[in-house]
Amino acid sequence: MAAPTRRTVLGLARCWRRFESPWSLGSRSLTLAAAPSNSASPWRLLGALCLQRPPLVSKQLTPMQEEMAALLQQMEIERSLYSDHELRALDEAEQLEKKKSDLYEEKDEKNILLVQDLEDMWEQKFLQFKPGARITDADVKNDRSSLHRKLDRNLILLVKDKLGDQDVWMLPQAEWQPGETLRQTAERTLATLSENNLEAKFLGNAPCGHYKFKFPQAVRAEGSLGAKIFFFKALLLTGDFSPAVEKGRHVWASKEELGDYLKPKYLAQVRRFLLDL
């Protein structure tokens, strides 16, 4: 009787030690992770804004797309039911047939809807309508600082900023400040950039990409090795830069035009999260 009892007690003790050891290790790990570090990071954190103006008009159809659209429209017409206007046209034709025969009565005249008159009026309105031009004055002048260009494409905002003693094109950015999230840094960038003239919708709280670079030697001597930039996407809703903003310091570029401004390594990281559908 004593032997089984002893084996049971020893088994419980071993189980307790196995149960206790992970929790003890986890407590030590949490304590070590929570310990503050006295060494400051040599990397500065920045939040960058990828502000896009979405297309304002649809793209031109390719010849194949036009053929497919015509085919689908023809199929829809063949399978569709009569619309209210077509039913009225049939009813009017029936009333006119009655008028030619002896079955027509004077009281039916007030119910006749002159469909042809309506169609003539609609035709006149259609002829007076003039669609807006796809090619704007900014397209003709190649004014890339204007927001009213390439209406059927996505445009990305680029700004010219100082990096050491050089003027470099980049996405708008600002340095992260303690107490704010990186998205709040990007939101602050938008507010200070346009003096609250631009309203945008940010897409998520997580960055869509990042880029790391080292400062020039003159700046690196101050204790910062380089910067880590975290990009946040946003869609432009309303607003534009005021006329007082210095020209030549910002452009609205399409995806193909980014290579005219951005450095190759920076451009490679930006293109990874850009979609031009």
Curated annotation (Swiss-Prot):
Q: What is this protein called?
A: Large ribosomal subunit protein mL46
Q: Which domain of life is it from?
A: Eukaryota
Q: Which GO terms describe its molecular function?
A: structural constituent of ribosome
Q: List the GO cellular component terms.
A: cell junction; cytosol; mitochondrial inner membrane; mitochondrial large ribosomal subunit; nucleoplasm
The source organism is Bos taurus (Bovine)
Name a Pfam family for this protein. MRP-L46
Q: Which InterPro entries does the record match to this protein?
A: NUDIX_hydrolase-like_dom_sf, Ribosomal_mL46, Ribosomal_mL46_N, Ribosomal_mL46_NUDIX
Instruction: List residues modified as N6-acetyllysine.
Output: 228
Q: How does it assemble?
A: Component of the mitochondrial ribosome large subunit (39S) which comprises a 16S rRNA and about 50 distinct proteins.
For this UniProt record, give its keywords in alphabetical order, as a comma-separated list. Acetylation, Mitochondrion, Ribonucleoprotein, Ribosomal protein, Transit peptide
Tell me which family the UniProt entry assigns to this protein.
Answer: Belongs to the mitochondrion-specific ribosomal protein mL46 family.
Q: Where can this protein be found?
A: Mitochondrion
